[in-house]
Amino acid sequence: MLPLIKQEDIKPEPDFTIQYRNKIIDTAGCIVISDSEEEQGEEVETRGATASSPSTGSGTPRVTSPTHPLSQMNHPPLPDPLGRPDEDSSSSSSSCSSASDSESESEEMKCSSGGGASVTSSHHGRGGFGGAASSSLLSCGHQSSGGASTGPRKKKSKRISELDNEKVRNIMKDKNTPFCTPNVQTRRGRVKIDEVSRMFRNTNRSLEYKNLPFTIPSMHQVLDEAIKACKTMQVNNKGIQIIYTRNHEVKSEVDAVRCRLGTMCNLALSTPFLMEHTMPVTHPPKVAQRTADACNEGVKAAWSLKELHTHQLCPRSSDYRNMIIHAATPVDLLGALNLCLPLMQKFPKQVMVRIFSTNQGGFMLPIYETATKAYAVGQFEQPTETPPEDLDTLSLAIEAAIQDLRNKSQ
């Protein structure tokens, strides 16, 4: 309820009129209530849905409802603190709304470009009940109660190394390792023992070979070595190595075998890779004697042995390819070997297959251990199912016994 006001406290204003539904109302019994704080230009935050509601598509607040009877009253213009000329209520309200729209758009642009900063803007207008000015608080981005808002966390980019650039000579060049140039004439053809240093000049070319430059074992030797390993029922320390030249025909045949190997079970196949070679050197007898003595003394002496002999020439890679096949069981080792040995028979100088040994480090992945144990145990277990041949023999014996019983009964 409004407090009672004495008649002498009411001061009439001669230029004050109230218009309601296009009718002028007598102001003799009307009281105008105004907020002194809003007249002084201070910001007042409107609260509640009845006081303000954002308009669709813009950030301008609406103070009063147009259906309210007091919203259509004309009140006397209040003095502008900035000294601007007065305008009628309709023009001022329209200009205020348009200005607030433009300001809200500009504030949104600033917020989007500023990374979620909070912006406060106040709009003053003389329309509404008692000429009260309206103010609104615009905020964009995420605000936190504890302080300034933080932007999204940036994901760090991972550095992935390229396999093509992991050659030893490329790494040495990146480390600014100086390379010496051999004092020999560079030419094509076979290399003599006293001119072997010319093979290790600073160049990006590989050592090219039409045929493999080492002794190739026979197929019988490779198969015999594989059978000896399979008799132990454990082939986790054995593997197949394939070495072949870069001839197009040879590569096509090897790729066809690789496709068939990819369909087999219990195999670990490597991608074809190159070998890099360093400068050969003959150690003097003193170095050989110190190494032999350290090995005879035991592990501690061998660990303490420091015999590092270096060179300053550029390593060179050979152009023939290498591939390693690791099998889990003897079944898979012999199956892979049966696919690889025909390559040696077809290309006796360009393809070599051999069996190599490793320590008891296990398989490439632990998923093959179950298959290995099952193979070793399976040789000593009795078959649970009767073979089909035994079933046929048993059925024939039953039929013969039935026929004998019939003959005796007659």
Swiss-Prot record:
Activates the E1.7 promoter. This activation is augmented by the IE1 protein. It down-regulates the transcription of genes under the control of the major IE promoter. This is 45 kDa immediate-early protein 2. One of its GO terms (molecular function) is DNA binding. Residues 47-67, 90-101, 132-147 have a biased composition (Low complexity). Pfam families: Herpes_IE2_3. GO terms for biological process: regulation of DNA-templated transcription; symbiont-mediated perturbation of host cell cycle G0/G1 transition checkpoint; symbiont-mediated perturbation of host cell cycle G1/S transition checkpoint. The keyword Cytoplasm does not apply. It comes from Human cytomegalovirus (strain Towne). Transmembrane segments: none annotated. The gene is UL122.
